Amino acid sequence: MDHTAPTYMLANLTHLHSEQLLQGLNLLRQHHELCDIILRVGDVKIHAHKVVLASISPYFKAMFTGNLSEKENSEVEFQCIDEAALQAIVEYAYTGTVFISQDTVESLLPAANLLQIKLVLKECCAFLESQLDPGNCIGISRFAETYGCHDLYLAATKFICQNFESVCQTEEFFELTHADLDEIVSNDCLNVATEETVFYALESWIKYDVQERQKYLAQLLNSVRLPLLSVKFLTRLYEANHLIRDDRTCKHLLNEALKYHFMPEHRLSHQTVLMTRPRCAPKVLCAVGGKSGLFACLDSVEMYFPQNDSWIGLAPLNIPRYEFGICVLDQKVFVIGGIETSVRPGMTVRKHENSVECWNPDTNTWTSLERMNESRSTLGVAVLAGEVFALGGYDGQSYLQSVEKYIPKIRQWQPVAPMTTTRSCFAAAVLDGMLYAIGGYGPAHMNSVERYDPSKDSWEMVAPMADKRIHFGVGVMLGFIFVVGGHNGVSHLSSIERYDPHQNQWTVCRPMKEPRTGVGAAVIDNYLYVVGGHSGSSYLNTVQKYDPISDTWLDSAGMIYCRCNFGLTAL
């Protein structure tokens, strides 16, 4: 006998034992052996063991161990649980499996909720979430709210908001109460191309039962971001809609919206700020690539969270680059063109790119997309009507005035009308359905501004900035275009100015605390974040944010890396 061998062992038979135990208990139940409780629903009797039911349900445990009368009874009657649902739950108690379908879930979930069987309740909610579509999401949302299924309620609400344009054409939408409708259209995350969609949805809901519902018009209209509607639309609304024209409160709301367009001093009031919050407003900043030194081209990417004033690193670019364009479309970050550098023996090679990369926040990965028709660095990029526009720039030999747009549906770049002049190192912005090309170099420093009208496929000059600028930041909020920092050909700038399209006028605002060129700028919650750049003596990672209401600057947490001539966007 080998005395070195262990004299004992611990056999782990947990899985086999559990399986055997469940099978044995289930056989006892099926044969009505050792059963000590009968659950009765109508004329149906379900035999079971108290200890098994109590082990999976706090409800049953309280019933069989507490001071309730059922403790001593051998039969309990249920009047508020569906027979098939109770059968399914008892089956689950003995087998660990439960059948969930569209036919059973509406009775099974309330039963699991009443009996406090969390695992079954969780699976029912997961099943309903997988079944969400425009025709049932409102009903599922109500169902979840009734039974306190918080996560399912949030998922259904998110689905409603993301698919609002389809949801507002369904029967469930027209059967909403005015309070439920008001809650939906007040949501900041409503996914609509324009605020007109929200108004038309409300109008359709009211016309579904106009006699009963027209009394809610003013209350509901107050949830529409009316200042985000065009002057033309607001005017036509007043002229063509007698329900609005005949209601004093509605007329007042329309007049206030028109003031926003014609009286710019009203835009900086607190109430106007609330009424002009964009739907699906950006919540985080994304800083991409750039330079951190004379020959240091970055591929790193980082994200800023205003809630806790902090930055984290993300997946790097496929190609290190700087002086590129950046934008967000369908919650994906597009990085377009720019300069790639590579080091060869005794020299640094600069390549002007026509390549495009796209970052998916769901997977934290970068993928390549279709290349532009032309190589472009120091270009302007913006999204207009669901298409990505790439403007001007420099191809390594010439300054460009050409413009092309990327159409996601056909995955192609197509040319559009060129700008009136060549521009590089400039900024592009979209406001009120128009595309602006601002400042830049071509081949002199410029303060000129031109505007593209997509309906005419043509450009026109508008009022110039006060300062000439290259490599500056731009942001749009409260109906204004803000430009900040840059270089005027002589010195680095700390100045900021805003453009009012209705007055066709630029106004100088309070300057930054320090000058910056090659700076990034983006808007979150009506703050203009100004990030990184070069001060004239050093590369920066510092961040300031501008509050247009108080015309003041505040400090925020700095980036992980110093960056200049990089991409910054909000999403």
From Swiss-Prot:
Kelch repeat start-end pairs: 284-331, 332-386, 387-433, 435-479, 480-526, 528-570
Gene3D superfamilies the UniProt entry points to: 1.25.40.420, Kelch-type beta propeller (2.120.10.80), Potassium Channel Kv1.1, Chain A (3.30.710.10)
Assigned keywords, A-Z: Kelch repeat, Repeat
UniProt cross-references to SMART domains, sorted A to Z: BACK, BTB, Kelch
PROSITE patterns reported for this sequence: BTB
BTB domain span: 35-102
InterPro entries from the UniProt entry: BACK, BTB-kelch_protein, BTB/POZ_dom, Gal_Oxase/kelch_b-propeller, Kelch-typ_b-propeller, Kelch_1, SKP1/BTB/POZ_sf
Organism domain of life: Eukaryota
PANTHER family in alphabetical order: KELCH PROTEIN (PTHR24412), KELCH-LIKE PROTEIN 28 (PTHR24412:SF441)
Protein name: Kelch-like protein 28
Organism: Mus musculus
